[in-house]
Amino acid sequence: MKFRKANPADLDSIEKIYDDIHAAEENGSQTTGWIRGVYPTRETARDSILRGDMFVLEDGEILGSAVINQILVDVYSGAPWKFDTESVCVLHTLVIAPQAAGRGYGRAFVAFYEQWAKEHDLPELRIDTNARNAAARALYRKLGYKEMAVVPTTFNGIPGVDLVLLEKNLNAFRPA
């Protein structure tokens, strides 16, 4: 398993993961709260690749992707964060191919994100997820992230989202 910055040649693989997740959402086998054609889309991935902040997980093939940057979502401004934003790093749109679910790839991607943030001296970590995404919420809590707020919003064009805002500080967190 390896992680690397995504490049334009990865776009089809990332889009396929998005499509597979949308199909799983539509058939009821996965709950993300995402909507096909609204978010995430090929354009979502393309824009992130062009910005240089999209990363992929490869294990024989591309099985996951995520955006890692310092871009704060608008709804973050009203949350009761414990840590300031000068040294913040945000994980956006973490996806693992549905056929690879349950094999530890999500946990590994979060570990990669934390290591990347540490190497870039960005110890304040933030993640958001749809409140309907119970699997993501459970994973993030298990990895030491604290739910700071649930904010009703229209998120990336999807109305009626209860966005869960999570935080972790690498300097403050000590595993049990």
Model-inferred region functions:
Residues 96, 102-115, 138-142:
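Conserved acetyl-CoA-binding loop-helix of GNAT-fold acetyltransferases
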Residues 51-66:
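Conserved beta-hairpin
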Residues 67-93, 101, 154-159:
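Conserved acyl-donor/pantetheine-binding loop and adjacent beta-alpha core of acyl/acetyltransferases
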Residues 6, 94-96, 129:
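Hydrophobic adenine-recognition pocket in adenosine-nucleotide-binding enzymes
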Residues 15, 22-44:
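Conserved GNAT-fold acetyl-CoA-binding loop/helix
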Residues 2-16:
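A short beta-loop-alpha structural element at the N-terminal edge
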Residues 83-88, 123, 130-134, 141-143, ...:
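C-terminal "cap" of GNAT-fold acetyltransferases
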Residues 110, 117-128:
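Conserved GNAT acetyl-CoA-binding A-motif
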